[in-house]
């Protein structure tokens, strides 16, 4: 997916009034590390109204989630699945939106938001996790790309 498609997902989430914090590859970009990313990683406020807003934006963008034999593609079904507190990858016509929740090493929405700063990501002003939180999440994940990201984050910080 192109950054223009990611831009549109972010615009729609902001326009809907959804509360979220950007993490992952796009957060790295906001912190001076440029690299390709295949998805938008966000942590969302877990209250039912916010989950409904996120689900509505995803479904309006052609969003669906495959869960075994079931294909979830309505705001209600996606919001209900989000309410379970599990991580969810939503494939939309604009790209993949990863809702990160309940993973070890990932702070809660409230914790992330309290340390986040507003930054421009692909031309959209959004809450972006702090460098410290980003570093901690990358260390906790510990995959090869995460270790490279840590090195690049340190280099960008000077």
Question: Where on the chain are the PLM-derived regions?
Answer:
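Compositionally biased terminal segments of proteins
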Residues: 1-158
């Amino acid at each position: 997916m192109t950054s223009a498609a990611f831009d549109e997902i972010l615009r729609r989430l902001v326009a809907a009034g959804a509360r979220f914090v950007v993490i992952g590859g796009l957060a790295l970009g906001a912190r001076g590390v440029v690299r390709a990313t295949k998805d938008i990683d966000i942590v969302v406020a877990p209250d039912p109204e916010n989950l409904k807003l996120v689900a509505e934006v995803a479904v309006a963008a052609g969003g669906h989630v495959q869960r075994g034999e079931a294909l979830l593609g309505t705001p209600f079904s996606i919001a209900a699945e989000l309410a379970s507190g599990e991580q969810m990858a939503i494939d939309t016509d604009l790209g993949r939106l990863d809702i990160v929740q309940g993973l070890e090493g990932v702070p809660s929405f409230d914790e992330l938001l309290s340390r986040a700063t507003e930054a421009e990501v692909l031309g959209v002003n959004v809450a972006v996790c702090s460098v410290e939180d980003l570093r901690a999440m990358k260390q906790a994940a510990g995959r090869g790309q995460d270790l490279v990201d840590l090195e690049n984050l340190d280099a960008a910080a000077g």
